[in-house]
Amino acid sequence: MKAILWCNGANPNSSILDEVLSNDAEVFGVDGGADKAAEEGVVVSEILGDLDSVDITRWEGRVTELIDQNNSDLAKAIGVLTDRGYTEIDVIGTEGGATSHVLGNWAALCDAPSGARIRIHHNDSVTSRFHPDDGEMEFLVGEGEVFSVFALLPGKVWISGA
């Protein structure tokens, strides 16, 4: 199953929206990201978060409050979707705002349980999370394309053909 998490940062550009929204995935708002998605005309199935930045009056019956203040709304939302069986999660709306939120987004990838391929879509690139418990993964990069590999936790990486 595929899901999109729309965060409360700057709205993604049209090319990201075209790419991600065409994947027949269910859209979830991460707190105030639900309002931003709705403003773009996107149907949001459910709001996930601590609800501190969303107008919950417009979302009656589609709100799941995630109270744990030890984790970010994004980390909690990824955990909920993984528990529900989603195996592909695209995250959008993460650009802009405080620089610390960038680190928080990557930390959410580290904290997320195994079982789902997670991608954060930036205006100029995509961050893909590969969890070591998910087994071997292959990531193909086209000739001449720029890529980077960073291990946020201990792991093993083999690169060939670069």
Regions found by a protein language model. Give the residues of each.
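Short gly/pro/ser/thr-enriched loop/turn and capping motifs at secondary-structure boundaries
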Residues: 34-37, 54-56, 98-99, 124-129
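Long, charged alpha-helical interface segments
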Residues: 125, 130-162
